[in-house]
Amino acid sequence: MSELTRTKVLFLITKSNWGGAQRYLYDLATTLHLASFEPVVILGGTGELTQKLESAGVRTITLQTLQRDISITKEIGFMTELWRIIRTEKPDVLHVNSSKAGGVGCFIGRLARVPRVIFTAHGWAFNEDRPVWQKFIIKKVHWWTVM
């Protein structure tokens, strides 16, 4: 197949440490048939996942604004950067992993008209110990992402 017919899959995950969600994403990105698919991974930080993906030949894009903790200025920066990347990369599929990447990724992916957006939950942030108002917002965002 030629480069033009490969399906571009843009993966998004919040953290680049090595854990369950990261291992899942690594397995998906590194086992795609490269003649048919072009995997690109967007992640926060330069941890072990980044190193493993790059060693396996998977292109990564690191965002310093993509962090687990909530910060309005970082969220705006993250959304802006993600919008720019999606518009530049023009993925056929956006595969988002984890709560934060899932909520923001689905929202921006829909705005940018990505043909297919897939969300994989690796735990529910609204079950964590956090203020009630955050749990409420997180539940609403999760509801919206699956619709």
Feature roles, as predicted:
Residues 37-40, 92-94, 147:
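Short active-site oxyanion
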Residues 85-92:
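Glycine-rich phosphate-binding loop signature in dinucleotide/nucleotide-binding domains
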Residues 3-7, 11-74:
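N-terminal strand-loop element at the rim of the active site
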Residues 96-102:
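Short His-centered aromatic/hydrophobic patch
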Residues 73-80, 115-116, 125-147:
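Nucleotide-sugar donor phosphate/pyrophosphate-binding loop at the beta->alpha transition
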Residues 9-10, 93, 109-124, 142:
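Active-site proximal beta-strand in glycosyltransferases
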